[in-house]
């Protein structure tokens, strides 16, 4: 019973809640999101809302589509390869190095933000995405601040670390750990 779409959605929803300044972002977990988004034997819903954060799905046909979505969604997106089938939390894109970054909930890859080249899917094969539709107009997180004042003025996202699970079929036990700096 793989729940990679659910784990990835919970990660992206938490990031959105933090960017929006929601004090209760810690309530957004794989288990809590699953209570409204997961259908046993079917998978994740196309559209769902938990604790003020709404996710919806769409289809993509290219890596360029993913770049555009990441520009519009600083919290990141869920990228799904229906042929694999597997999903990752696609967090950002570095144009200078032409590198995408993600958090992959699979046991072999369960780490904090890593290059997509370390994920078990290829972005060229991603055909479905989920992204946050509410709250909207989120500001991009500060990855590194030049001054203390810059850091205080900008929202920031803590590093996301995922605890390994025992198998790809048992992803429902993935835990999300966040550390605030």
Where are these regions (language model features)?
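Residue-level detector of buried hydrophobic side-chain packing
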Residues: 4, 90, 178-180
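Conserved active-site-adjacent core of cysteine acyl-enzyme catalytic domains
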Residues: 10-151
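RTX-like calcium-binding, glycine/aspartate-rich low-complexity repeat tracts
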Residues: 145-181
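Sequence contexts marking disulfide-bonded cysteines in secreted/extracellular proteins
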Residues: 3-5, 108-109
């Amino acid at each position: 019973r793989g729940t990679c779409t659910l784990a990835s959605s919970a990660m992206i929803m938490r990031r959105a809640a933090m960017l929006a300044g929601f004090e209760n972002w810690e309530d957004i977990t794989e288990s809590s999101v699953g209570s409204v988004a997961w259908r046993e034997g079917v998978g994740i819903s196309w559209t769902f809302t938990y604790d003020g954060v709404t996710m919806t799905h769409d289809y993509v046909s290219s890596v360029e589509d993913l770049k555009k979505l990441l520009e519009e969604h600083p919290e990141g997106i869920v990228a799904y390869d229906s042929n694999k089938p597997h999903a990752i939390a696609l967090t950002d894109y570095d144009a200078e190095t032409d590198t995408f970054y993600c958090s992959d909930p699979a046991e072999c890859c369960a780490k904090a933000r890593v290059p997509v080249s370390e994920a078990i899917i290829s972005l060229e094969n991603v055909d479905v995405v989920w992204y946050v539709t509410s709250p909207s107009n989120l500001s991009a997180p500060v990855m590194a601040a030049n001054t203390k004042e810059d850091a205080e003025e900008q929202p920031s996202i803590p590093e996301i670390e995922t605890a390994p699970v025992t198998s790809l079929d048992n992803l429902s036990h993935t835990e999300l750990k966040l550390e605030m700096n």
